[in-house]
Amino acid sequence: MATKISQDNPLSKITIFLIIISVIWVKLNVKPWEKGKVIDWDIVDYYDYLPALFIENDWTLSFVKKNEEYYYNNHIYWPQKTSEGNYVIKMSMGLSYLYLPFFWIGHLEAKIKGLPTDGFSQPYHKWIYLSAVFYFFIGLWFLRLFLLRWFRDKVVAIAIILLVLATNLFYYATHESAMSHVYTFSLFSVLIYLWDRWFAYNKLLTGMFIGFISGLIVLIRPINIIPVVVFPLFYNLIDIKQIKDRVVYLLTQYQQIILMVFFAILPWIPQFYYWHLNTGQWFYYSYGDEKFFFLKPQIINGLWSYRKGWLLYNPLMYLTILGIPVLWKYRRSLFWSYVIIFPLYIYVVFSWWCWWYGGSYGGRAMIDIYPVLIFALAAIIDRIFNLERSLRFFKYVSMIPAFMLIYWNILQIIQYRHTFLHYDSMTKEAYWKLFGKPALSDTAYWSLLSPPDYEKAKRGESEYP
């Protein structure tokens, strides 16, 4: 049953502030901007819309032709080429909206310090990197507000601590934080809170925010249309048969739904314009020969492989499976949205040709739906706190594996940071050779790695050589 949010709930508040302080501390110690290692790889494509528009004043990227080798080799601009020879940025521009205020802060700092104002000097890297802290705080705060509708303060606090510190979310909040996942995690946390408020109070302004945030989430990562659509259909249903009533209710609110759709389209309008400007098409698939293989989903590999198994490298998330019957029995209102989003998302995510998602840590694609997966985690924690007095000792014993999971995640992050836990080439032999060690001096270890065959994977074949 949902509970009224207390104005106090100090433990979960303190938890979030301590997490953010920890994230900032790690960031200020890592300082990747000093080596220009923030706006790089995928982030180049998320970010390039901003300097191209506001500094080069050229969204067609025609200036790249003048020195193409320099731009590509230095990972500054590396757009795709259309069949007509035009340039088009591969990723959609959703993250650029979120980067924008921090881009201008970096631009101002570069001007004040007399550094190049080309969009790629150190201040730009720094502020894009730090932008994730702002959005991560917002995401955690709204996730907390949502969870407090269903769970006690101490349960929410512990669930958030474990979700952040014992999973790959912590790595992407502190190290590669300019990647999309912390941003989409945060936006989806806000979205589920807004849907809860909309169903409770049916406010027009809430609906407008729901629409815009939904459109932005999908623009950043189109695969996220799954939780964006499924959650409001199945949230807070006790019985699956109530889906008919939910659809009927939404149809009776057609004016607000139309308004939501309108606001969902708004963030896409500049993207449509950009595609049309550079390709002549209002909608353009910029991923070339990269695609989904829905008849060959790599679910087993995606969850358990040594290369990049999500559950292997995030063992805490086994509780997201074990917690399903707990949700069914004790938090039925959260159950249906959970059991539909979770397997459907796994199926689609691991149907992508590059199911291991390139150079990354621990199945990063799953982070986007962590605001939903925390339901089962919180439900299990809640049941532990509700054990009979004779079993209360289990509550304290359970703290041991909780601390071990946090320790294990931090250890793996250290391994990954120093490339011992390899970004795409782990094998069974390498995993067990490295197991439990922060580093290795044995040079023979590197011969145990097995890089994936990306070209074979693009054809839907096994990437193992």
Predicted features, each with a name:
Residues 1-31, 138, 148, 156-157, ...:
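Start-transfer (signal-anchor) and selected internal transmembrane alpha helices
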Residues 230, 237-240, 252-325, 332, ...:
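Membrane-lumen/periplasm interface segments of specific transmembrane helices
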Residues 13, 111-122, 140-167, 186, ...:
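Transmembrane-helix signature of polytopic, membrane-embedded enzymes
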Residues 31-38, 360, 397-465:
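Membrane-embedded, lumen/periplasm-facing catalytic core of multi-pass transferases
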Residues 126-151, 189-194:
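Transmembrane-helix motifs of polytopic, lipid-linked glycan transferases
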Residues 183-201, 205-214, 372-376:
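Specific aromatic-rich, kink-prone transmembrane helix
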Residues 10-40, 48-51, 58, 161, ...:
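Transmembrane signal-anchor helices characteristic of membrane glycosylation enzymes that use polyprenol
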Residues 50, 160-161, 206-222, 228-233, ...:
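Membrane-interface alpha helices of multi-pass inner-membrane proteins
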